[in-house]
Amino acid sequence: KGWPTLNGSLTIDPKGPWEEDAPCVARLREHGAVIFGKTTMPEFGWKGVGECELTGITRNPWNLDKTPGGSSGGASAALAARMGPLAIGGDGGGSIRIPSSLTGVFGIKPNFGRVPMYPAGALANMTHVGPMTLTVEDAALLLTAISEPDYRDWTRLVYNNEDFTDGLDKGVAGLRIAYSPDLGYANVDPSVRKVVDAAAKVFESLGANVEEKAPGFENP
C-alpha cells in the first residue's frame, strides 16, 4: 500500500493508486516485518535475466559482469549483497528458482494456492508467490507467515496452521527423488551437469532414493 508496483514496465503510471497491500505483504506487516525496499525485475517477469527499460541492468553481486537471473533477479541480488535477510518473489517458469541458483541464495516455488495472491493475474494458476532468503530456516519461517489465509483469494488452499519450520530436522531418508539435468532434450554445459550430479549424490548419501528421469517434455 502506497508503494508503486511497476512490474519493471514504463507502461504503468507510478502515481497509482496503490490502495492496499497484497496478501503476503499484509501478513508480513501483521508479524512485525520492516519493509524497506522494492527490487527490480524484467518487464512483467518475461525474462530470465535482470534487465528492463525502467531500471536498467541489475548485476550479480558475486560477479558484476554476470546476471543475477530473473525474473526475481533484483530480490536475489539484494539478498546476495546482504541488503536484507528476506525477500518475496514470484515464480511461473523459474522466476524464483533461476535467480536463487545464480546468486547462491535459497528460494522455493510453493504449490498452487499455498500462498494467497490478490489481485490474481492472467497466469495466477501458474505463477506463485514464494520466499527468497539467505537460509532454508528463514525460508521456512517466511513461508509460514505468508501462507496464512486471505479472504480475497478464493483459490487458496485450506489452511491448517502449518508451521514449515517443523520439518527442518526430519531429513530426507526414504524419500523418492527424481531429477532431470536436461529435461530429456536440452544441451547442458558439462560443468553444470557435474554440479547437479554431485548434488544428487549428496541426497543419496543422506538416505534418499534418487533416480534420473526425463519428464517426457518435447523440445519446444
What is each residue range found by the language model?
Residues E53-G56, T103-G107:
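Short, hinge-like loop/turn segments at secondary-structure boundaries
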Residues K1-G93, A173, A199-K201, L206:
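Gly/Ser-rich catalytic/binding loops embedded in alpha/beta enzyme cores
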Residues R97-L102:
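Structural signature of FAD isoalloxazine-binding scaffolds in flavoprotein oxidoreductases
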Residues K1, G216-N219:
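Short, internal active-site loops enriched in acidic
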Residues E43-G45, S95-I96, N187, P220:
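Generic structural signal for helix capping and beta-alpha/helix-loop junctions
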Residues F106-A199, L206, F217:
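A short helix-breaking turn/cap at a secondary-structure junction
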Residues A87-I88, N187, E212:
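Activation segment
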Residues F36, N209-A214:
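General small-molecule cofactor/ligand-binding pocket signal
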